């Protein structure tokens, strides 16, 4: 009987500790830091302006979803919607090829883009001759990196 009572007390203490830790964890996390199951629009635009007859070839995928490839003519775009997973580890990468140039980049990476794509939850990329530009409103573009 004494052993049974000790096990019950031990389980009760373990359960109480788990609840206390859960309360502490929830109180530390601010709602603005939670980006679980949020939806984002991601867009990649062919921003070449030299009237090239060569398309911008793009292929995008995550570890769970292959979006396939597209051949984008000037001003064409490739867009998709995604939702972040529970661990905020959602990650889509794209490989872009134009003429002899080839570049892989992170089109969406949850830890980086949860804030960067706010407040509209829009992550847009404009691919130009001199590099890759990012915008979260499709108006203000900032060069993120070169080819």
Outline where the language-model segments fall.
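Intrinsically disordered, low-complexity segments enriched in small/polar residues
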Residues: 2-87, 95-147
């Amino acid at each position: 009987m004494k052993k049974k009572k000790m096990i019950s007390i031990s389980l009760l203490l373990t359960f109480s500790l788990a609840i206390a830790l859960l309360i502490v964890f929830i109180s530390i996390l601010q709602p603005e830091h939670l980006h679980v199951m949020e939806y984002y629009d991601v867009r990649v635009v062919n921003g070449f302006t030299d009237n090239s007859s060569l398309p911008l070839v793009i292929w995008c995928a995550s570890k769970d979803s292959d979006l396939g490839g597209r051949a984008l003519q000037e001003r064409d775009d490739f867009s998709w919607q995604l939702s972040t997973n529970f661990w905020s580890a959602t990650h889509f990468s794209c490989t872009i090829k134009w003429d002899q140039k080839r570049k892989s980049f992170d089109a969406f990476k949850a830890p980086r883009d949860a804030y960067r794509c706010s407040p509209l939850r829009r992550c847009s990329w404009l691919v130009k001759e001199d590099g890759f530009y990012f915008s979260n409103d499709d108006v203000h573009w900032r060069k993120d990196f070169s080819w």
